[in-house]
């Protein structure tokens, strides 16, 4: 574990008080941390604190802050729009995209999704997915805490056409080159379909909206593999673009 992830309500001046029973158990009983030990603490969407344990009580840990690194906004934010996946595949995908780094995760019930999420009864999934995201942040040391959203289809999402350039992963698309220009946009949206690909109505919709259709110089990928590959591909392109 490279860091723990906490909310801002754990702050007490220059100190951080950890009262969460699971975190307490892991740090005290599993990792055997003691007074004087150091640990990085990520406060969601705020800062990373290099901290030191000053007191361990029967049900709390008190940290003092040695250094504060503010979380700077990236030059580009990446949002992914992925179809709901069957079984535990979505858990693995979430863990890996968080480790790579993504600003927003949108899970959509595509027309051809084999497994669909009940949007009106998603509280249990939200809780489970949030735990997966936190665990991935702890293990990877990534500072980007992504938002997660659920939608019933691709047609009525709150797309941001003025600030975001959207790319649809599809076999009919163009292969992106290192010369791809991302000028005038601060966000990238990557749209990946289900195992059965997009429906005809979804493809027509994306074309009407002027989205960019792209493909990758690879064999046909499973949906879960395509999500990871697409995100890593765009991250590499953006790093080259930003020098």
UniProtKB/Swiss-Prot annotation:
It holds the Pfam family Methyltrans_RNA. GO terms for cellular component: cytoplasm. Keywords: Cytoplasm, Methyltransferase, rRNA processing, S-adenosyl-L-methionine, Transferase. One of its GO terms (biological process) is rRNA base methylation. Coiled coil: none annotated. The keyword Chaperone does not apply. PANTHER family: 16S RRNA (URACIL(1498)-N(3))-METHYLTRANSFERASE, RIBOSOMAL RNA SMALL SUBUNIT METHYLTRANSFERASE E. NCBIfam families: PRK11713.4-5, RsmE family RNA methyltransferase. Belongs to the RNA methyltransferase RsmE family. Specifically methylates the N3 position of the uracil ring of uridine 1498 (m3U1498) in 16S rRNA. Acts on the fully assembled 30S ribosomal subunit. This is Ribosomal RNA small subunit methyltransferase E 2. It comes from Borreliella burgdorferi (strain ATCC 35210 / DSM 4680 / CIP 102532 / B31) (Borrelia burgdorferi).
